[in-house]
Regions:
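Bacterial signal peptide processing site
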Residues: 23-25
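Hydrophobic faces of well-ordered beta-strands that scaffold small-molecule active sites
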Residues: 66-70, 109-111, 147-149, 191, ...
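Bacterial N-terminal signal peptides that target proteins for export
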Residues: 1-10
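An active-site-proximal structural segment forming one wall of the substrate-binding cleft
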Residues: 89-108, 119, 123-153, 157-193, ...
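Solvent-exposed loop/turn segments at secondary-structure junctions
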Residues: 72-76, 108, 115-119, 153-157, ...
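Active-site region of glycoside hydrolase catalytic domains
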Residues: 169-281
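C-terminal motif of bacterial Sec signal peptides marking the signal peptidase cleavage site
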Residues: 18-21
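N-terminal carbohydrate-binding accessory modules
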Residues: 30-108
Length: 281
């Protein structure tokens, strides 16, 4: 759809996070060696940037004023190796670009990233690709911008029940690696589990799906949340974004239950408004 890119950019500025934050639970506090400071921040002996555990989801959302979507770059699907970044015609991302975005008034950036072409036969993500993703994240993070990092044009997580076990294992493996790499980052880094998981090229692609597809998406959301939380460090408290089937605002997203509910939000976009505008000029 020609309006999808605009919708994605608008979505990045409107991080839809629901629920209230809460302090670190006793259940999670005994195994990591992390220190919860008297001001509510978390540190792990100095290597991690302090995570504000007192920050609620609604407070974080309010602090995100306007966001910018770095599209058609790390989410591109052409090229090989690091040339994937420029395979759709955009130049390589530079610190100057991100500085210009901040200077224009943006305080959040979404970094859509396609990992599929960078995963080896053994399931390991290319170290070079991980390093480049981290470098771009750091361009914004070091400017105290919020950064939303996701898995984007992945062909392998179409939510069919007979593929759920295989997809869930791969999703968990990928997010475990990503989360481990970024576990010391504070609340300015947000993970978005999937982008528009759906049955592609079917009658169910964009109409809200069916019970099977929606159920599998919710199970995959749980796998994502559990994988990130299990890596420990600041990922125990990280704000996570899950999406419903096809990221459709008419669907409901699910995750792993009450214990996780205080630090995740639903990422949706509405294309109907764009379609209506296009029809009526």
């Amino acid at each position: 759809m020609s309006f999808k890119k605009q919708a994605a950019a608008l979505m990045a500025a409107a991080l839809c996070v629901t629920g209230a934050g809460c302090s670190r639970s006793a259940e999670n506090s005994g195994n990591t060696g992390d220190t919860v400071n008297t001001d509510g921040t978390v540190s792990d002996g100095g290597s991690a940037r302090e995570f504000d555990t007192e920050l609620t989801a609604m407070q974080l959302t309010s602090d995100i004023k306007i966001g910018w979507n770095l599209g058609n770059t790390l989410d591109a699907t052409g090229g090989s190796g690091l040339t994937q970044e420029t395979s759709w015609g955009n130049p390589a991302v530079t610190p100057e670009l991100i500085q210009a975005v901040k200077d224009a008034g943006f305080n959040a950036i979404r970094v859509p990233t396609t990992w599929e072409r960078q995963i080896g036969d053994d399931g390991t993500i290319s170290a070079d690709w991980m390093s480049r993703v981290q470098q771009i994240v750091d361009y914004a993070y070091d400017l105290d911008m919020y950064v939303i990092l996701n898995m984007h044009h992945e062909e392998w997580y179409q939510p069919y029940a007979d593929k759920e076990e295989e997809i869930s294992a791969k999703l968990s493996s990928c997010w475990t690696q990503i989360a481990e790499n970024f576990k010391d980052y504070d609340q300015h880094l947000i993970f978005e589990g999937m982008n528009e998981p759906r049955w592609k090229n079917t009658d169910y692609e964009w109409n809200g799906g069916n019970d099977e597809g929606r159920t599998v998406v919710n199970h995959l959301n749980k796998a994502f949340v559990d994988a990130v939380r299990a890596t420990g460090g600041n990922n125990q408290y990280r704000f996570l974004m899950v999406c419903p089937y096809a990221a459709n605002s008419a669907c409901r997203a699910g995750a792993s239950g009450r214990r996780q509910a205080h630090r995740f939000g639903s990422r949706v976009h509405t294309l109907q408004l764009c379609a209506c505008t296009a029809r009526h000029g």
